[in-house]
Amino acid sequence: DVLPFQFGNMARTVSEYADEMVSAMEKTRKDVERHNMLINDGHYKAAANIREVYVTPELREEVPYINLSPMKNSVDRLLASGKAFDDAYKAMAALGYNMSKDDINKLDKLMYQIEAKLTRPEGLPRRPWYRHHIYAPGYYTGYGVKTLPGVREGIEEYKWDETEEQMVKLAEVLKAYCDQLDLA
């Protein structure tokens, strides 16, 4: 039998995660700008308790504009590949999976091995034992899941070079995933 895989929902979910990363970058940028403005304009000092020693918070590094194209392009391709597979699967099901046993076995092998395409042998920053680039436990959250963990944690930790590097790696794993999906 043909394994019952569908990829459209997964593609839409990953697209939502990517949109969250874009929003997180913008929110972080605005938060840093506001934080620095409050320091520079003396608002923190004005609100400080005069009975306690006041220590001015440190200014934060401005959030750079990171090239989001690798992630966005790979997600767009994932959406297209997922839809194409789901459409072909429905058409094949309507015809009763009229395929040779050998073709069914090849298709099934492609499908059950596809999840491995979302991993990289070097793993994630600071924890190489976690290799999945869509879902992984957070570095600081224990077993709480992080979506697109390399990119998300780079943003959360203000590590912009790492964020950009992880965005490229995410695009690479999504490309490999789509390449395998397109073979099916």
What are the residue ranges of the model-derived segments?
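Secretory-pathway/membrane protein signature
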Residues: 1-184
